[in-house]
Curated annotation (Swiss-Prot):
Biased composition (Polar residues): 227-236
Native organism: Mus musculus (Mouse)
GO cellular component terms, semicolon-separated: membrane
Keywords: Membrane, Transmembrane, Transmembrane helix
Main subcellular location of this protein, as a coarse class: membrane
Its membrane topology: Multi-pass membrane protein
Disulfide bonds: none
Protein name (record): Transmembrane protein 270
Gene name in the database record: Tmem270
Amino acid sequence: MEAAPRVRSGLLRILLRAGRLSALLIQNRTHLYRFLLLKMAIFQHWVLGLAQEARGSGSDQARQLPEVIITCALSLALRAGLTLLWVPMWLLLWGPRLAYRVGLCCTRTVRLALGHLCVCEPLGLSPATFRDLFLSCLHSLMLVALLLLLLTWKLMQKAHHFSLGWLPSQNSVLLEAPALLRRLYLWVEHRTTLTSWNLAYLVTWTTCLASHLLQAAFEHTTQLAQAQEVKSQETSGPPPQFLIPESSTTESGPLPPQPETPGE
């Protein structure tokens, strides 16, 4: 009974891996087609070499066959390096444009907000709140730019490392190619996972910062409302003074005359 869930989980993992690999193959179908063409060319050269060896003239072709395999392997390595370099080049070309567009959107929103300050000031949204929001957007953009630069630098470093690893000897190139490709795939998968987690952390951090700023703005609004209520109560007028009624003065009669001085 316990083995059935394990088998199911193993099948689900295999299906997920197969789905990921199929998605990667669909995304990189042009490179896959080129790789298949290279394999077909190598196989064709190998078959021609076998046929010529069977005919008796395979001495020259036997010498040329390793050279063809080496050139095909080097061309494959060159194309793999170009595909690795294409990602940082795309990031370098389109990353600043995306950052510029996001900055334009932020500046437009800030301008609109500052244009409606006369409407928002009674609600308690002061210019300091808008300034804090704008600074948080700038900080998030700077973090995204630094993350893209770090990823580009790491990709360039790895591409250089792998390009140096292909050079030492021809036999080692042919033997270590699958291991290098496997290590490269694992490294790319690890980097994409780290990048996705970093982006998720960045989005969460910006969301928390925005919520904190909104909470501070609402608290400031309530404080301003309370202060305005206190001011309105103070400026509504002084408390009513107790005036002496006239009836009391009339009932008591006229005031007694003052005593005259001896000179008068």
